[in-house]
Curated annotation (Swiss-Prot):
The keyword Nucleus does not apply. Binds to the 23S rRNA. GO terms for cellular component: ribonucleoprotein complex; ribosome. Keywords: Ribonucleoprotein, Ribosomal protein, RNA-binding, rRNA-binding. It comes from the Bacteria. InterPro entries: Ribosomal_bL9, Ribosomal_bL9/RNase_H1_N, Ribosomal_bL9_bac/chp, Ribosomal_bL9_C, Ribosomal_bL9_C_sf, Ribosomal_bL9_N, Ribosomal_bL9_N_sf. GO terms for biological process: translation. GO terms for molecular function: rRNA binding; structural constituent of ribosome. The lineage of its organism: Bacteria, Pseudomonadati, Pseudomonadota, Alphaproteobacteria, Hyphomicrobiales. Gene3D superfamilies: Ribosomal protein L9, C-terminal domain (3.10.430.100), Ribosomal protein L9, N-terminal domain (3.40.5.10). Belongs to the bacterial ribosomal protein bL9 family. This is Large ribosomal subunit protein bL9. The keyword rRNA-binding applies.
Length: 179
């Protein structure tokens, strides 16, 4: 099916491009989400009349994403999870967990904006890419640790492997609450 793109889509094209995609992709995703129009004469004329509005809206969204990116780029977030002695997590850190942590910090991020190449299954520092807009990508660091104390050590030492961090945390005496 030939479609006219109403916004920039990765690996597909820019605003106004006429591209050919599979029928299901167009019918089930691009057309219902308002990201494209069928490429017929009426829609081509409609697009040409609306082109300036669409480009202005895209520029506005891009500027908004860049403002968020300036505040969020390079920031780090702490995730506390239980893990074994080798640093292997009991489970994994998913895009839902990352979305919740970033949202608790006051940012509005959707799960589909997070790009995880592989699930996070070990403690340590993990870079994660956020796609705020098709033209705006940033990187944040996820600190996965067993406790807040261990996360603080990871931030201070950033070079420590998960096993070394484990040894340091185990060597420190536990603070007892004497009431």
């Amino acid at each position: 099916m030939d479609i006219i793109l109403l916004e920039r889509i990765n690996r597909l094209g820019q605003i106004g491009d006429i591209v050919s995609v599979k029928d299901g992709y167009a019918r089930n995703f691009l057309l219902p989400k308002g990201k494209a129009l069928r490429a017929n004469e009426a829609n081509k004329k409609f697009f040409e009349t609306q082109r300036i509005k669409l480009e202005a809206r895209n520029l506005e969204c891009k500027n908004e994403a860049q403002k968020i990116a300036e505040r969020l780029n390079g920031k780090s977030f702490i995730v506390v999870r239980s893990a074994g002695e080798t640093g292997q997590l009991y489970g994994s850190v998913s895009t839902r967990d990352i979305t919740d942590i970033i949202t608790m910090d006051g940012f509005s991020i959707e799960r589909n904006q997070i790009e995880l190449n592989h699930p996070i299954k070990t403690i340590g520092l993990h870079p994660v890419t956020l796609n705020l807009h098709p033209e705006v990508q940033i990187s944040v660091t996820i600190h996965v640790a067993r406790s807040a104390n261990e996360a603080q050590l990871q931030e201070e030492a950033k070079i420590l492997t998960s096993v070394e961090a484990t040894e340091i945390v185990q060597e420190q005496p536990l603070e007892e609450n004497i009431g």
